[in-house]
UniProtKB/Swiss-Prot annotation:
NCBIfam families: ackA. Mg(2+) binds at residues 10, 385. Mg(2+). Can also accept Mn(2+). This is Acetate kinase. Its EC number is 2.7.2.1. Gene3D superfamilies: 3.30.420.40. GO terms for biological process: acetate metabolic process; acetyl-CoA biosynthetic process. It comes from the Bacteria. It comes from Histophilus somni (strain 2336). Keywords: ATP-binding, Cytoplasm, Kinase, Magnesium, Metal-binding, Nucleotide-binding, Transferase. Pfam families: Acetate_kinase (PF00871). Its main location: cytoplasm. The gene is ackA. It catalyses: acetate + ATP = acetyl phosphate + ADP. ATP binds at residues 17, 208-212, 283-285, 331-335.
Length: 398
């Protein structure tokens, strides 16, 4: 076992996901979630060396209390002493950050500058960085920021620009940035390994499907397009987000229906997607389990898969070379066999033929090719964003 471990922090506005990984073996020593920050029932749960635990953090507790609890109560002395660096997931790096970086005062300012593009996430990441500096002062120079947007910074101008007045981009940074970059990067590299193709030669379309969902076109190992845009609202149908829609619907909701901007934002971000279409839940498992018996479940899944297939088809065109594979990952991508089946059935024109037995088997941690022999490849690969963060952090710190 490597004696140098990486603590990984993923700070949300009201939660903190954490893990400790060996960046060499990938072994997970600790994982956990602190949630309900600032509320009366703030709490934390964890798994340490296979043993589960949970505790109340106290009314109104937040990031500081959670990290202090991790350090003082959860971590053993040996584990604490083995932490050699800290990796921070940062949602938005703007145009400035195209790769992971050691956190300096300049980087902190860059994360602040990009906060206008991720107003819920980036300020929370900054709190996490500040608290990590306090909790591990001896590791201040060994904190690394890993940006969700970085992998997509290779998109060409024709992919990232909107057809808006160019001044909005030049003066205000209004362009497409994309998200889930760490996941798209990881599974594209894993696909290259499994298919025995060099990382800088792999051509894949990666589908990260979860409560948030996005697809990326990767040509010769580099991202050339992705479905999320200026914010994570653009693109695919998601758990509660609408994805693509006619912008004039917003004018209609405001001018004709009398909805405020705040109400419209809440509708598009929190009340749409699978939740809006089913009028029941944002959980894809409901739509999958009830597909044959509930019209709302069928409606939601059909729209979800149609939108996904349309993106995949368009990305086949822009990759413009032999496509090595379609990759499914994320909670839905890795487990929802019906979603994969319906989506690939839309792509029969391109030769895709699902193997029902392989597709059904590729769930709950099982992976592999799900298409028939001698047909174009679609493959399920579980994502591991934490491992990428750990490896990048180790590479820049050790």
């Amino acid at each position: 076992m490597s004696q140098k471990l990486v603590l990984i922090l993923n700070c949300g506005s009201s939660s903190l996901k954490f893990a400790i990984l060996d960046p060499v073996s990938g072994a997970e020593k600790l994982s956990g979630l602190a949630e309900a920050f600032y509320l009366p029932d703030a709490r934390i749960k964890w798994k340490l060396n296979g043993e589960k635990g949970n505790a109340d953090l106290g009314a109104g507790a937040a990031h500081s209390e959670a990290l202090n609890f991790i350090v003082s109560t959860i971590l053993t002395e040996d584990l604490k002493n083995s932490i050699a660096a800290i990796g921070h997931r940062v949602v938005h790096g703007g145009e400035k950050y195209t790769k992971s970086v050691v956190i300096t005062d300049e980087v902190i300012q860059g994360i602040k500058d990009a906060a206008e593009f991720a107003p819920l996430h980036n300020p929370a990441h900054l709190i996490g960085i500040e608290e990590a500096f306090k909790a591990f002062p001896h590791l201040k120079d060994n904190n690394v920021a890993v940006f969700d947007t970085a992998f997509h910074q290779t998109m060409p101008e024709e992919a990232f620009l909107y057809a808006l007045p160019y001044s909005l981009y030049k003066e205000h940074g209004v362009r497409r940035y994309g998200m889930h970059g760490t996941s798209h990067y990881f599974v594209s590299r894993e696909a290259a390994k499994r298919l025995n193709i060099a990382e800088d030669k792999i051509n894949v379309i990666t589908c990260h499907l979860g409560n948030g969902a996005s697809v990326a076109a990767i040509r010769q190992g580099k991202c050339i397009d992705t479905s999320m845009g200026f914010t994570p609202l653009e693109g695919l149908v998601m758990g509660t987000r609408s994805g693509d829609l006619d912008p004039a619907i917003i004018f209609y909701m405001h001018n004709t229906l009398g909805m405020s901007v705040a109400q419209i934002e809440e509708t598009l971000v929190k009340k749409s997607g699978l939740l809006g279409l089913t009028e029941v839940t944002s959980d894809c498992r409901y739509s999958e389990d009830n597909y044959e018996k509930e019209s709302a479940a069928k409606r939601a899944l059909d729209v979800f898969c149609y939108r996904l297939a349309k993106y995949i088809g368009s990305y086949m065109a822009i990759i413009g070379e032999n496509l090595d594979a379609i990759v499914f990952t994320g909670g839905i991508g890795e487990n929802a066999a019906l979603v994969r089946q319906i989506t690939l059935n839309h792509l029969k024109l391109f030769g895709y033929k699902i193997d029902d037995e392989k597709n059904s088997a590729a769930r709950f941690g099982n992976e592999g090719v799900i298409t028939a022999d001698n047909t174009p490849i679609a493959i399920v690969i579980p994502t591991n964003e934490e491992l990428v963060i750990a490896q990048d952090t180790a590479r820049l710190s050790f």
